Amino acid sequence: MSDGLDVIVLDDDPGISQVLKELIETFYSWGEVVCFSKAEKAIDYCLKRDTGVAIFVVDVFLKDMSGFFFLDSIENKFPSVHEDAIMISGKASEDVVDMCLASNVTYLLEKPIKPYALQLAVRSITAKYLNFAKKLLRDPALAQSISSL
């Protein structure tokens, strides 16, 4: 586990999971990119992490559970998991869009994934954390108040 902002990829197809990992690694340098094809292994990994911040790329329809159930299962460790998730689906129906809206998930990409769309979604989530880090660097009092939490 790195000290950076990692990307965690979960797709029940190991080939797709690996391709997404490799694609993200071509443009992402702020942390590690790890991939899983089994939801339970991804949950175990996430719950054992030291930090509760990451970017998630998750398939909507997994074999053992829905991608939304996966997000819900790690929400105590990752309070912003829904806002930091990019959901992917082979068929982005109105029901899937409604589930994203109900879960506070902003990003939904349809397979086959367009590399630029994935890059923009990942960069958008990354920018949120980079902007917050800049605020902490410019405001020592804010940084001190947060560190005491």
Predicted feature residues:
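C-terminal output helix
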Residues: 113-122
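Alpha4 helix (beta4-alpha4-beta5 surface) of REC/receiver domains from two-component response regulators
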Residues: 69, 82, 92-107
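Acidic catalytic/metal-coordinating carboxylates
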Residues: 38, 66-69
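Short amphipathic alpha-helix used as the core "switch/output" element in two-component signaling
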Residues: 44, 68-81
